[in-house]
């Protein structure tokens, strides 16, 4: 994400130093069991858990109508591919201003959370912080509507309601669409 801001040479240096520092700090935790358990956890995260997932639930519903196969088993790789392509697109498109970097991080994280299989309410905190430095308010709406996800918890289990998810995500998507459309309209009028 820092490529346009720092340039190729400084970016490579920055990432090498960052990875090197984390690798050194990580040495005390190195063990075969750690890697085995960590990879198992990541595998579970992307291929077993489902909670408060907007786009994923919609795709799952469409897939159930068409062929009935389980989408969750392939969702991990789909999320990685989509977020990687989105990041590459934004890196190429972005200007070299710091405000643009924060906006790009906001778009990458938002895209990830929109297609993720699991979105707990506290995940949006980073988006909320980033949105303070942009003109976009859809994250603020999302932070208000996310409280509805707690309706899925009852005394013994977690059971999500489609109507609650629709009620939760419709205002967010409408606000995002309105903001994107109005900002595009402003750019067209300014030209």
List PLM regions with ranges.
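Aromatic-enriched
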Residues: 136-191
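Aromatic-anchored segments of alpha-helical transmembrane domains
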Residues: 21-28, 108-116, 143-156
